[in-house]
Amino acid sequence: MRVTDFSFELPESLIAHYPMPERSSCRLLSLDGPTGALTHGTFTDLLDKLNPGDLLVFNNTRVIPARLFGRKASGGKIEVLVERMLDDKRILAHIRASKAPKPGAELLLGDDESINATMTARHGALFEVEFNDQRSVLDILNSIGHMPLPPYIDRPDEDADRELYQTVYSEKPGAVAAPTAGLHFDEPLLEKLRAKGVEMAFVTLHVGAGTFQPVRVDTIEDHIMHSEYAEVPQDVVDAVLAAKARGNRVIAVGTTSVRSLESAAQAAKNDLIEPFFDDTQIFIYPGFQYKVVDALVTNFHLPESTLIMLVSAFAGYQHTMNAYKAAVEEKYRFFSYGDAMFITYNPQAINERVGE
């Protein structure tokens, strides 16, 4: 399969730079997996699409203010993007600089360069940085960090993004990008879903900066997926197995919830799914056998991204590309702050040939 098979034309005007004033007021394009039929509506239509007893699985990761500006003590400006927090004092990060810092280099971070840190080691493209400060890494980031808006949102971060680029149920700090399908859920909608009898469970996947890395190979089978830490606790496993047992659906909110659930299913020895606390490099593309997820809530993804490949594996390649073509024609808003899709599983997707 070629990466170019997942390309589509997207006018720049359709990239959303700000979210809708009300979280749940975005548009919703529904794709029926088995038939490819499309329905246009608004996000709150989800209430009618879910049945009592269906299980919604959310990702409760919380975005950290992961972008830091500063300079090397020796002079040159730097930009630091945290990939993950290693402990209370150390981070693993991408560093942009005219000349990469060497181990032992002193860094002065923050808009006022008040935070002292040392680059202690290099791991491939990533740098290990230790803060010389009494406070924990998280406190330092909350104090001097900027929200790491995706590269396609071409504007500086604003104070409002600290709330807007965060799901209302976010709980566990560690992500450098929001699980964006969840941004559309507000408390009134969650309350109505609960009142209808829709069950809810929470996995954790700390989204890394690798989620924005382009696929740099021609053939997708050659792509090496970035690694992210995921947690699927026992209560989620129990909720999934109970939903399946009573004939209800498991609906993943976002591709990160999909990757968490399917990672836990892949690693399971004795059951459909078992608890999972580990890094995952799961790469889902056409031909992948889904085991857990029956329906998916997701945003519109970048051309040639691993995420549009995941959706194609779920709904079928042709159905997915047709839906994206319709979304462009109907002027849906794309990417992190954009509109959403509701997709049901296409069991025939696994047999579809792509690019032939």
Swiss-Prot record:
InterPro entries: QueA (IPR003699), QueA_dom1 (IPR042118), QueA_dom2 (IPR042119), QueA_sf (IPR036100). The keyword Cytoplasm applies. Pathway: tRNA modification; tRNA-queuosine biosynthesis. Its main location: cytoplasm. It is found in: Cytoplasm. It holds the Pfam family Queuosine_synth. It is an enzyme of class 2 (transferase). GO terms for molecular function: S-adenosylmethionine:tRNA ribosyltransferase-isomerase activity. Transfers and isomerizes the ribose moiety from AdoMet to the 7-aminomethyl group of 7-deazaguanine (preQ1-tRNA) to give epoxyqueuosine (oQ-tRNA). Monomer. This is S-adenosylmethionine:tRNA ribosyltransferase-isomerase. It comes from Escherichia coli O6:K15:H31 (strain 536 / UPEC). The gene is queA.
